[in-house]
Amino acid sequence: MKDVAIVAFSQSDCLAQAGAANEVELIMPQLQAVFQQVGLNNAQDVDFVCSGSCDYLQGAAFAFVAGVDALGAVPPIKESHVEMDAAWALYESILKIRMGHAESALVYGFGRASSGNLRTVLSQQLDPYYLAPLWIDSISLAALQARMLLDRGLVTERDMAEVVARCRRNALNNPHARLSGEISIETLLAEPGLVAPLRKSDCAPVADGAAAMIICTVEQAREWAVPFALISGIDHRIETHNLGMRDLCDSVSTRLAAGTAGVAQGPVEVAELYAPFSHQEIILSRALGLGADTEINPSGGAMAGNLMMASGLSRIGEVFRRIVSGDISRGVAHATSGPCLQHNLVAVLESA
Amino acid sequence: MATLAAVVGIGQTRYKSRRGDVSIAGLVREAAVNALKDADLGWDDIDAVIIGKAPDMFEGVVMPEIYLTDALGCNGKPMLRVHTAGSVGGSTALVAASHVQSGMFKRVLTVTFEKQSESNAMWALSTPQPFSVHLNAGAGGYFAPIIREYMRRSKAPYDVGIKVAVKDRLHGARNPLSHLQLPKITMQEVEESMMLWDPIRFLEACPSSDGACAMVIAAEELVAQSPKPPAWIRGVAMRSEPTMYAGREEVSPQAGRDCAADVYRQAGISDPRKDLDCAEVYVPFSWYEPMWLENLGFAPQGEGWKLTMSGATSLDDGGDIPWNCSGGVLSSNPIGASGMIRFAEAARQVRGDAGNHQVEGAKLALGHAYGGGAQFFAMWVVGAEKP
Amino acid sequence: MNDQVEDITGIETPVYLHYHFTAGSAPARFLRRIKEGVLTGQRCPRCRNVYIPPRGSCPACGIPTEDEVVLPDKATVQSFTVVAIPIPNNPIKPPFVIANLVLDGANISFIHLMSECDNSEVHIGQRVQAVWKPVDEWTYAMDNIRYFRPIDEPDVPVDRIGTLATTGLET
């Protein structure tokens, strides 16, 4: 199977509100950044483009169509789109490369969740007949999951606060972070509940922004003479939508995907996990079988800033950065979609 | 170096304005079950599921793959949801095919759908956008001026669109799945129907349908496991261009021409009219048949309408290049599925499985879908023979 | 007593979601000017085409458009259709004309209403001018212009539409 390499990655700052910036204005700087990293001009210089976004975040159908205006798509280009986090747009692009119809691809994701009330918008992901009319928001669902974990003695509130504190501390090294800093466990635990047992700090701060990545064959990476990281394994799995029919305290799909992607076939020096809530990082790390040797979310993860529709791609990008900088030679990145970790993607990255 | 892949099962639902007997999950499952039955396979034979549909706003379900995984036997498997506006039915088929063609999967299920009766597509397509003039124009309001420009350039007679409207509905009358069953439709009836967006009359526009379409696509090594003849995928292509830019050719978009050239090259087609036996082409407004005949290279520029008027695209007239024998988008239009229906109907033709709308001896067929402001194109060529 | 009770096969579940909408930086500059009654386009630094309403980038080149160009409110009909479907909350009665209009000095069209015209006389190349709402009704929107009406100027040849300078067709 053809090896796919990541050669460029860029992410915007995680902004609480992007202000007066439309899709095109959010995306363009990130596209220009990745083109510059490789020495390209615009989408004409790659063989395929795939993006990830969700109309409902912005409240306008066809939000992604606006994004095409940022590409320089004249003459016409090969372009596609998934209504999902851009990590899945990356997946679609890998298929394109592996079937030999592209040597390179541009992947990007973007979202302006600040336009609407995200937790309410996401309630409309639920079964439209039985659940959506109840308007159960995403934070409440995560809180249910956290409650189960606590009641079963699988985590403590202190464990959750430790995730938050560690991520915020790590985020001090992340220039794009929305939230970073030293904060004590006691301070965190003293916060009142937002939707108990979740405190506001347990919820990754949602951010507007965009992220972009360029991938290609190893031959193309060598031709461009740029440093790269190999995607040595990637897989994703979805679980039942019925919350009562799966074990919310475990992530079976993450474990399955990790197996196929070959996580355990080598040391996991770094793991960037897309955990929109602190307790979910713990669930994921256990499902991936991560040990004390793995540094989890050195970028701060989504706790530093949750770029809706791009956070998954960003996790992959953060591992890529650490490989090409020489910090590590092998890492794992994860992306999630749906309520309570319903759908999970796992990628294993290695140095060339 | 792509793995050879083929369509080994096709399933559709009867297209109607309202399927009040099934939920959205029930609708997609019906098509999926039909496809599995057609392929003589079970849920466990499927490695991944790829779904597609038009904007979530149509039914108001955000990211519906999350809700539909159970209905499609996808728990514990990979699931992807493609969305490329109106061409989504086609691009979903292409993304599904790429799962197999990449060598990463052996057999996948792909489903597209729209339950328009549970949504308000007109509203979703024309939601008042702040700061913009609200014209409630919808798709018709966008395409009518372009059609008018085609008519001006080509000097086509006024009734070309009417002829297509009749032809496609007569084809649809041969197809028991078709939403519109109008075996007695006449040119006069179409001409007298209400003008909606001049020059598009009511009967020259597509209906709004509930429906789903599914296919099972398998790698070469597994094709023989399914009893019916396969439709080998001989070419796949997609192209996009911006909605609007200075100097954009809107009547015959470059993206469409480039996409066709790419798919023809892969399939070894040099003269589409001669080399193809039939085509299922996305024609939601009747005039788009002559326009796409030119855009896709079946007729020289300015002469697509002559091909239509000659009866060449009519199965009933014994035309040499029948288009939309299934009835096309003009007979059934569940928006998210319409593109895949074109791809699936092209596959049915080369499998010899198109029932009463079969083109005798069809060996090579084109499936075509487009979307957005005629800016997103997805096409495939399928054949009875391996390449 | 009602013997016939229909099975319930569906429920109506209204979804109300509130959004704060932003037009974007480049469109916002355009909107601030249109509130003053001034139409402005933005020019692409590479291909030099002028876009109105601007969206922040030249779609063909994929780069930001910055230079502001003030445009007159005269335009040419590039294409049009006659619509039979009414617009909610708009007094205009079907059948009415919506047209793709190219302002003098711009290189792309935008869609707007035409009125004060005989629908059957609307044609490609026709010259039109904006009819604005009263000043006190002006806001951040293209519909400060109520509609465009035909003016007495020579038609623009089809191959010149979209290429005129801000001064219009030279005589």
What are these regions, as identified by a protein language model?
Chain A
Residues 1-8, 33-47, 55-69:
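N-terminal glycine-rich anion-binding loops that anchor highly charged ligand groups
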Residues 3-19:
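Generic N-terminal amphipathic, Lys/Arg-enriched alpha-helix
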Residues 18-40:
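Short catalytic helix/loop segments, enriched in acidic residues and glycine
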Residues 21-24, 28-29, 53-106, 110-111, ...:
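Claisen-condensing/thiolase-fold acyl-transfer catalytic domains that form or cleave C-C bonds
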Residues 32-47, 149-156, 222, 257-269, ...:
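Phosphate/pyrophosphate-binding loops at sites that engage ATP/ADP/AMP, CoA/4′-phosphopantetheine
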Residues 42-45, 155-161, 174-180, 227-228, ...:
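Flexible, glycine/charged-enriched surface loops at secondary-structure junctions
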Residues 105-153:
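Flexible glycine-/small-residue-enriched beta->alpha junction loops
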Residues 136-184:
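N-terminal leader/propeptide and maturation segments of large enzyme subunits in energy/redox metabolism
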